[in-house]
Amino acid sequence: MIEHYLSQALIGLTLAIATVLLFALAHWRSRPTLPLPPGPPSEFLLGHSRVIPKENAAAVYAKWSKEYNSDIIHVRSLGRSTVVLNSADVARDILDKKGANFCDRPRFTLLEVMGWGKTLTFLPFGQRWQMHRKFLQTSFSNTNVRRWHTLQITEARRTIQNILKKPETWETSLRRLAVAIVLQVSYGTQVLEDDDPYIQIANDAMYATGNGGVPANSIVDLVPFVRYLPDCIVRDWSLRFARQWRWAIKKLHDVPFAAAQAENVTHHLLREYKDKESRGQEQQWSLDDIKGAAGAVFIAGTDTTWATCVIFILNMVLHPEIQEKAQQELDAVIGSDRLPDFSDRPALVYIEHIVQEIYRWSPLAPLGIPHKSLHDDIYKGMLIPKGTSKAKVSLLLVQAN
């Protein structure tokens, strides 16, 4: 009996050693002939797994960029390379000028577990990605967005009235403003009160999405089959968090969609879907696709609008001299008997610059959604391997410099 267990243990040990050796051989054979971008020291087999930041990643990558005197940083974890772009110039060179090679996305398994499926931001390059992208580009072209100007003006003035009535709830009023505009555009549904249930739906979805870890960098992203294992085996907080908060993403997709009214960006998709369904024709858009497209608009517009308004107010409080100059420009352009509208925007140059400075001073998403390369690429003598994820630190170092 003892000999049997010893034999089984020896076989297991042999297989483990063989696996490690094969992995090491594959790693050695895959070594690039050109240098990779600089980065922190790596460990054998593990690479940078133990140093890749799980929290406040943008600040850590910015620190490494200064430490290694490079606007492009490379890290590797369990065989997957990630290149971090730390300046606007490098981002333009790689993501814009070479966009055809870097248009793909890595698979976001963790976000799939959370409920983000057919949403453009997280889709890999392919037919579905092209379909979603074309729809959103058409819906929000420079011409089409003008039809929402009246809605934006109405909601902005309603927000001002709410703040005048209850100045202590100004932040909640701004949250309602953001949700009201995006929900009307996406689903044709009105949000009139500061305590509307849709505001909590948006808050829950944003919390779930923003607090589950760095996209494409969790254990389940690196080893996708882990998603099928129970928490007692995996013991990964990000996977457990995604499972616990899946309800919030499902609610974001299902509740507004069920109450959708006419005259919104997804209305014609739903109408086309029902027409084809009644005729028994093949569907290009599934219901999940339509929900995903509407959800992408909802999640992208809600938090960014609210955060920009809050940061604007913060800066006006901190810099009253800037606020005074902005007020002087408003008085000069529109006087004191009316409120501004979109026709006044070209003349409000100083206020436009304030808004642009807010974008620069406090980027709303310091760490952008990763891209993935379709083929090997060479940038300034450095190799970016095929399948590499690119995370762009949005203007983080530009503001620091």
Model-predicted segments: where are they?
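Conserved, well-structured core segments
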Residues: 43-45, 73-77, 81-86, 120-122, ...
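N-terminal membrane-proximal hinge/A-helix region immediately C-terminal to the signal-anchor transmembrane segment
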Residues: 2-115, 131, 153-158, 370-372, ...
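Hydrophobic, repeat-rich solenoid/adaptor surfaces of innate immune receptors and signaling proteins
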Residues: 85-88, 186, 256, 308-313, ...
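Cytochrome P450 catalytic-core helices
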Residues: 178, 304-322, 327-329, 395
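Conserved cytochrome P450 K-helix/beta-meander segment immediately N-terminal to the heme-binding cysteine loop
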Residues: 386, 392-401
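Cytochrome P450 core scaffold surrounding the K-helix E-X-X-R motif
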Residues: 91-96, 192, 397-401
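Cytochrome P450 catalytic-domain helical core, especially the substrate-recognition surface
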Residues: 41-62, 81, 108-187, 200-258, ...
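Cytochrome P450 I-helix active-site segment
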Residues: 38-41, 153, 200-207, 263-272, ...
